[in-house]
UniProtKB/Swiss-Prot annotation:
Gene name tied to this protein: ybeY
Protein name per its UniProtKB record: Endoribonuclease YbeY
Organism: Xylella fastidiosa (strain Temecula1 / ATCC 700964)
Required cofactor names: Zn(2+)
SUPFAM superfamilies per record: Metalloproteases ('zincins'), catalytic domain
InterPro entries: MetalPrtase_cat_dom_sf_prd, YbeY, YbeY_CS
Gene3D superfamilies tied to this protein: Metalloproteases ('zincins'), catalytic domain (3.40.390.30)
Length: 161
């Protein structure tokens, strides 16, 4: 098993006041737990947005006219990218704070646990995981459960059917 990451750069930016948002160190911990044993170097950005920005991004990139909880944008480096200059850029994660807060309340979850789950979920998308069909969804959800359990966070899918 690969130990790591040995290099982790997670940039956090906020498109709204930081009230009731997890600290940057929490996001870094959740990303590191997701990458543990999978990748040793990573550079990614997380942006926390309001509903207006979240809706605009979801519409622009997915043609869906509503704000969603998390969007992931894997890095697309031009080919061929010189090996000597190659950076371990995974991509960007956008999280919509009002949607996440609303979901946490509706689902009876702590806000921190819900952010942790969606950070893990978004990071897995950057690593190539998807949930386009039941088999992919089951595999991704199981991995999310394992990562969150290692963080001391209970199964986010309990009670769903």
């Amino acid at each position: 098993m690969t130990r790591g990451p040995i290099f982790l750069n997670v940039g956090i930016s906020y498109g709204l006041p930081r009230t009731k948002l997890p600290a940057a160190v929490s996001f870094r911990k959740w990303v590191a737990a997701t990458l543990q044993g999978r990748i040793r170097k990573a550079d990614l950005a997380i942006r926390i947005v309001d509903e207006k920005e979240g809706r605009a991004l979801n519409y622009h990139y997915r043609n869906k006219d509503y704000a969603t909880n998390v969007l992931s944008f894997p890095a697309q480096l031009p080919e061929p990218f010189p090996k000597a200059l190659k950076i371990p850029l995974l991509g960007d994660i956008v999280m919509c704070a009002p949607v996440i807060a609303r979901e946490a309340t509706e689902q009876g979850k702590s806000l921190s646990a819900h952010y942790a789950h969606l950070t893990v979920h978004g990071t897995l998308h950057l690593l190539g995981w998807n949930h386009e069909d039941h088999q992919e969804a089951d595999a991704m959800e199981q991995l999310e459960r394992e990562i969150l359990a290692n963080l001391g966070i209970s199964d986010p899918y309990l009670g769903e059917y």
